[in-house]
Swiss-Prot record:
The keyword Cytoplasm is assigned to this record: yes
A biological-process GO annotation: L-proline biosynthetic process
Species the sequence originates in: Rhizobium leguminosarum bv. trifolii (strain WSM2304)
PANTHER family: GLUTAMATE 5-KINASE (PTHR43654), ISOPENTENYL PHOSPHATE KINASE (PTHR43654:SF1)
Protein name: Glutamate 5-kinase
Metabolic or biological pathway, per its Swiss-Prot or TrEMBL entry: Amino-acid biosynthesis; L-proline biosynthesis; L-glutamate 5-semialdehyde from L-glutamate: step 1/2
Gene3D superfamilies: Acetylglutamate kinase-like (3.40.1160.10), PUA domain (2.30.130.10)
Amino-acid positions noted as binding substrate in the UniProt annotation, renumbered to this chain: S56, D143, N155
Xref: HAMAP family: ProB (MF_00456)
Lineage of producing organism: Bacteria, Pseudomonadati, Pseudomonadota, Alphaproteobacteria, Hyphomicrobiales
Binding site for ATP: K16, S175, D176
Record-annotated PUA domain positions: 281-358
Amino acid sequence: MTSRKPLGRYRRIVIKIGSALLVDRKAGLKKAWLDAMCADISGLKAKGIDVLVVSSGAIALGRSVLDLPSGALKLEESQAAAAVGQIALARAWSESLSRGEIVAGQILLTLGDTEERRRYLNARATINQLLKIGAVPIINENDTVATSEIRYGDNDRLAARVATMTGADLLVLLSDIDGLYTAPPHLDPNATFLETISEITPEIEAMAGGAASELSRGGMRTKIDAGKIATTSGCAMIIASGKTDSPLSAIENGARSSWFAPSGTPVTARKTWIAGQLQPAGGLHVDDGAVTALGAGKSLLPAGVRSISGLFSRGDTVAIIGPAGREIARGLVSYDAEDARRIAGRKSAEIEAILGYPGRAAMVHRDDMVMTAQIGSKSERQKKDAAHA
């Protein structure tokens, strides 16, 4: 397992900041906290580290400015609050970072900007250019146009997508909790704190609880989801409390936090994009033999597919699901859903006779696939990743 190292030894760090850290429901923006955070960022920049910030708080800040009532907001109220809050939030970051002679650049993303390949590449190029000129990208979901059907829904997973998009080697999720426990600590006083998580297993996933604040849409569940996206792409992750001033300095000085080890070596940019897809277009349900073959680094053949779910087109990202019902991989499918159903369970040599044209032998080729669950030993997986990168 890759060992934990000080923040100063990472090359590129994505920092996600929760709404409750930045905004007080009554008092508004926590300016002193933001100034201390920006001083921490300035310290990292002075060491030559690229820093990106995924900042929640637009809706919460706009809500405070507009004096909207507590409780759930209607969609149009959330979008209006975001429109007001985004201006105030960007100005606050710009002013605070400027004290360290750092330029901030605002980027508002929608789900399509990371899920559609061409837009993904455009967004990545813009972010990389900002980093190249020494700026700090301040990234948030564009809540003024996002709807419940087309949104990330939380900035934890958005931050993980940004980390994989930009090739970051560390993702730091700052929240109102100091890390992962075996059970929600506010419900179970006997919950045990986990300092190091070598891999995200079903047992780890089961430990996740819900959101703790009306100002936040995320919770431990979304942080674990973010961890799966980030660590699969070779990016370590830290969950830490941001309640203290200068939380990054606190982490460096030994404050309690949970560290998630990257699950392997970083894969190619194409595979990174595949691994981080938030909404697969469908699913391929496979048998035990296929699971073993995929674990050995082989392609998914039609013979190992038991059933098909969803409607998808050739080239879409699909989830590959094992007999236990758990996703084990993601990949770009070689057939649309209708043809995939027709050849599922059949030998590759039969494809032309069934479909009337000579298709690809693999339902999902190994070069278009990323494992998202642990199969086999970690050393074996790392060798395969390196061989196919």
